[in-house]
Regions:
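Aromatic- and acidic-residue-enriched carbohydrate-binding clefts of CAZyme catalytic domains
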Residues: 117, 384-389, 442-455, 472, ...
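Bacterial N-terminal signal peptides
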Residues: 9-16
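Aromatic-lined substrate-binding rim segments of carbohydrate-active enzymes
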Residues: 407-411, 415-461, 508-513
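Active-site neighborhood of glycoside hydrolase catalytic domains
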Residues: 435, 460-513
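Active-site environment of divalent metal-dependent phosphoester hydrolases
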Residues: 206, 396, 425, 491-494
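Catalytic metal-binding/acid-base residues of hydrolase active sites
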Residues: 201-203, 423, 445, 487-491
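Secreted/periplasmic carbohydrate-active enzymes, especially glycoside hydrolases
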Residues: 1-4, 8-9, 21-420, 432, ...
Length: 513
């Protein structure tokens, strides 16, 4: 408790400096106004890619329609009610602000009325008890997106999610914390409008109290299992039909080798022959040093450090190909460490008949974590980690500003590591950690401390495996991430809360698989 009080004091000090220092003033109606963006960000498409890739951020006002639970529904039976389609003329007069859970005002709202989580006073009180709902947004597809692959991209939606385009279902998702995308190329047309429906059922509707536990998906701690709705960014993306789908950067420091595992996607009707090539540049941090400017992304590419030699790639129609590129390193790259968090940018291009088809950017650090016994090694040398850990507590943490303040406090205590606890944090936490030199023990949303996960359910374990896989794929290129915590307190809960030691072999096998 004392440690938490100290950390809270440090965080408060960082934000509550004199008004002039933090850009605050008082408006004519007596409101305290902060004159800088609450959540500064760069978007999904990097500026080096924008000649070839496009995006429209769909954040902002959406229409909202609550759906009542049927009278026959019984909580805790493991069978969720069906989500009926939205009704014409039944949309709420109050629009929802995306990203935000629709029941946000009920989080941490017991005897103390929040206090700092009542961030959406316009939301009707009845939304706090809604368990399933629809959200609607109309968007116009730009004329210059003709011939592109078009995707809807969600950074995170809490609940069982169904997505419709122009009243036709195009996809679904049931993970509360991780990104997903849906190809809608054949459902929309350049120059025309599209109506997006997103239907969400709270994970609590799927809970099963028949034996031990109740939650059938990894749902995190207090924040995760409570919220419902679109709680992170939404984008509409346009990609070239032939593009780099994924880049896995492997900094093999001990072998003096940088390995790039590149997946190239061909969404055309014919085989494509092309050339894959690239370069590696210094990533230079230009962020400010005061409390307002330091959390704001600001950078430029520095000198070219290495070239990625061109290779020929042949991709069948409507298929993908994985290419492994190896770049020898002989002192051209400086180590990433907490003391010197040097970063680099990989820039890969696809070229056919001297025409560049696509450009892909990926940031990384030249570092390698290894274990010898119980000792952590960073770049071949023993490295001691001193860290902090905390639960995710909602809207105040939905900004790089909080990550910067938290990590600044950690650095100020002569520490260098963090464990974002009990759920998957938004990816900008890892971005800031990369830039500030904070070592991250990433943790899944498999949090068992309240006895909530249904650890005897095959549904839970299948969801957990997919959850872990998607988590690693999201964060594996971050220089700051040194490990993966796959669960929290599962063993003591199995042994001392459930009193079911026979479940231990099942858990061990699930993670081994």
């Amino acid at each position: 408790m004392k440690r938490n009080a100290i950390l809270l004091s440090l965080l408060t000090t960082l934000f509550l400096l004199p008004g002039k220092a933090v850009g605050q003033n008082t408006s004519s109606d007596g409101k305290l106004v902060y004159n800088f963006p609450f959540a500064p960000s760069e978007g999904l498409v990097n500026r080096t890619e924008k000649e070839y890739r496009k995006e429209i951020c769909l954040n902002g006002y959406w229409d909202f329609q609550p759906v009542a639970l049927p009278g026959s529904y019984v909580q805790g039976k493991g069978v969720a009610p069906e989500l009926s389609l939205p009704k014409e003329g039944a949309w709420s007069k109050t629009r929802i602000k995306i990203p935000s859970p629709w029941n946000i005002n009920s989080f941490a709202n017991r005897n103390v009325e929040g206090p700092d989580h009542r961030n959406y006073p316009s939301y009707p009180k009845e939304w706090e008890q809604v368990k399933m709902a629809w959200m609607k947004k109309t968007v116009t597809i730009p004329n210059d997106w003709n011939g592109q692959q078009i995707k809807l991209y969600f950074e995170a939606v809490a609940g069982y999610t169904e997505v419709y385009i122009n009243k036709e279902k195009v996809g679904e998702n049931f993970d509360l914390f991780l990104p997903f995308s849906i190809d809608i190329t054949n459902k929309v047309a350049a120059g025309e409008t599209a109506e997006v429906w997103v239907g969400v059922r709270s994970q609590s509707l799927f809970e099963n109290n028949s034996t031990i536990g109740r939650r059938i998906v990894p749902a995190g701690s207090m924040w995760g299992y409570h919220i419902a709705g679109i709680w992170q960014d939404v984008y509409l993306l346009a990609l070239p039909k032939v593009h780099v789908e994924d880049v896995y950067v492997k900094p093999l420091v001990s072998k003096n080798m940088l390995e790039l595992e590149v997946t190239v996607q061909n969404n055309t009707e014919k085989k494509t022959d092309l050339q894959l090539q690239g370069k590696i540049n210094e990533w230079v941090n230009l962020a400010g040093t005061d409390v307002n400017s330091a959390p704001v992304p600001a950078w430029e590419l520095g000198q070219e450090a290495l070239k990625v030699a061109p290779v020929k790639v042949s991709i069948p129609a409507n298929a993908s190909t994985k290419v492994v590129l190896q770049v020898p390193v002989s002192g051209e790259l400086s180590y990433w460490t907490p003391e010197q968090p040097n970063l680099y940018a990989v820039l890969l291009s696809l070229q056919a008949k001297k025409e560049i088809l696509d450009m892909k950017y990926e940031r990384f650090g030249w570092r390698e974590w290894t274990l010898q016994g119980t000792t952590q090694y960073l770049n071949g040398k023993p490295y001691q980690l001193r860290g902090d850990s905390w639960h995710f507590m909602g809207i105040p943490q939905m900004t790089r500003r909080y990550a910067w303040a938290w990590f600044t406090a950690i650095k100020g205590m002569n520490a260098n590591a963090v464990r974002p606890h009990a759920q998957i944090y938004p990816r900008f936490y890892m971005d800031v950690a990369d830039e500030m030199g904070i070592c991250v023990l990433n943790e899944t949303a498999n949090w068992a401390s309240d006895g909530g996960p249904k650890l005897d359910s095959e549904l839970f374990w299948e969801a957990s495996k997919e959850h872990l896989k998607r988590f690693v794929l999201r964060d594996r290129n971050h220089a700051s991430v040194f490990g993966w915590s796959i669960s929290n307190e599962n063993k003591p809960v199995i042994l001392h809360v459930y009193n079911r030691p026979e479940l231990m072999p099942q858990q061990k096998k699930a993670w081994e698989d």
